[in-house]
Structures are given as structure tokens and as C-alpha cells.
Amino acid sequence: MTISLRAATVQFQHRASDKNYNLSIIERFIAQAAEQQVQLLAFPEMCITGYWHVRHLSDAEVRALAEPIAASPSLARIRPLAERYNMAIGVGLIELGDDGRCYNAYAVCLPDGALHVHRKLHAFEHPAIASGDRYTVFDTPWGVRVGVLICWDNNLVENVRATALLGAEVLMAPHQTGGTHSRSPHGMKPIPQALWQRRAEDPQAIEAAFRGEHGRGWLMRWLPSRAHDNGLFLLFSNGVGRDDDEVRT
């Protein structure tokens, strides 16, 4: 069994519905990770398709973005890189399932050609995107068992506990969060887009917002406990920058 695993996480600002652009950024980061001998690499939720804009799309437009996993053109670009660089690579997309429904999915491509897909258990992004119904835990070539929970899946303590009980030692937790329009009086709230637009002129202001109660501060209230309480490592990945009317942190 491997006693050490070099893991890395990526943040980038995706473009809405521009899969080719997003994949080009993903490929660039994979090459950089390979130079640093990364073995497990996590990208954010729905990083291939874009995220928050999908709520404005029609059912047909969501389906047009979706891809069947077995014949996914996007994953056909990622899987050979996992094999070439001996790396496990996790990416988010919209899956068109065999049942004809769409899913917020996270695909982990392994260097031996294996592919493991988690469907978000608590999907809310669009009425055409269904929720998954099972946990995802799998073995890796390094003797480490990995689980996946997408964004809000991690908010519920039972999901992480169930994933740990299935043997997960590392939890990949891809997100698109920060600066959200939470309806809870105790949840995070939007970050002014003007701060992001002026990030070059006033980097201290946007950094303070990112680290504050509507960004990292909110996550640090609860996310580390998921790892601590279940005796596992948590690999968090998030988008960054403007995402429709919100600002990711």
C-alpha cells in the first residue's frame, strides 16, 4: 500500500457552455501537474460545461451540453492524459445517462483506463438535471481508496460518513461555491461583482472577500470536520471568479 500520495487541486474560471475552451485550460493544468509528479488531480464541479448559467437554459439546451459517458468526446481528451502521465484525473460535466436523464456528474479517469463516475446526490441546478442515487468509492493503482461527493453532497454529514464506511481514505470534493445566494440566514451571501472586476486595481479587497464569511470563512466552519470526523483526507476543488450572477471563491 502506498503511504504517500501526491495530490493537487485546480481552480480556474470556466466559460459558460464553452467546452472546448474549458478543456484547453484543463489540459494545460494536467500537463503542469505532470511536471510536478502529481498522482491525483481534482478539477471543479461541472468545469467542462460551466455551471451556474445552466439554470437559464431550456431542457433541450441542457441535453445538448450533456454527453454519454461511454462515448464522451470530452473524456476522450482526458483519459489518454491519465494514462500518459500515470495520474488519476477528476473532471465535472453533465452526463446523459443510459436512462435518458441528465446528471451533474464527476468522472475520475485512472491511468489503467478505468473510469469511475459519481452523480451528484442532491442536484438543484436545473429541473432537467436529475439526482444520483448511490455513493461512489473505488480503488486506485496506489492502494488508496477514493470517494467522490459533489458540492452540496458534502454539506450533509451522513453522505461523508457513508462514503467513509465504504472504505474511502481520500474524498474528492469538487465544488462551485462561494458568494452564493443562500436562502439560509446563516449561509453565505453574494460577493459584489465589482470587487472581482477591480481585482487588478484592488487585490486586497477581493482577497478579503474570498477569505471572509461568504467564501473560505464559511467553508472552514464545517468542511474540515468532514475529514476529521471520518478519518480521511479531503481534496477540495472550486471554481473562481464570475459565474453568471455569483462570484466563486
Enumerate the language-model features and the residues they cover.
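Beta-strand-turn-beta hairpins that frame and shape the catalytic cleft
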Residues: M1-A7, V137-G147, A168-V170
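Active-site beta-strand/loop signature of hydrolases that rely on acidic residues for catalysis
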Residues: A7, N22, A33-L57, A82, ...
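Short, basic, glycine/proline-bearing loop/turn elements
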Residues: V10-S17, S58-A66, G143-V146, D202-R211
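N-terminal phosphate-binding loop and adjacent alpha-helix
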Residues: Q11-I30
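Glycine-rich phosphate/pyrophosphate-binding beta-alpha loops
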Residues: R15, C151-L156
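Short, hinge-like loop/turn segments at secondary-structure boundaries
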Residues: S58-E61, Y106-P111, K189-I191
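Catalytic-core segment of enzymes that process non-peptidic bonds
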Residues: A64-L149, D153, H228-T249
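CN hydrolase (nitrilase-like) catalytic-core segments centered on the catalytic cysteine
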Residues: A70, S74-A88, N155-T249
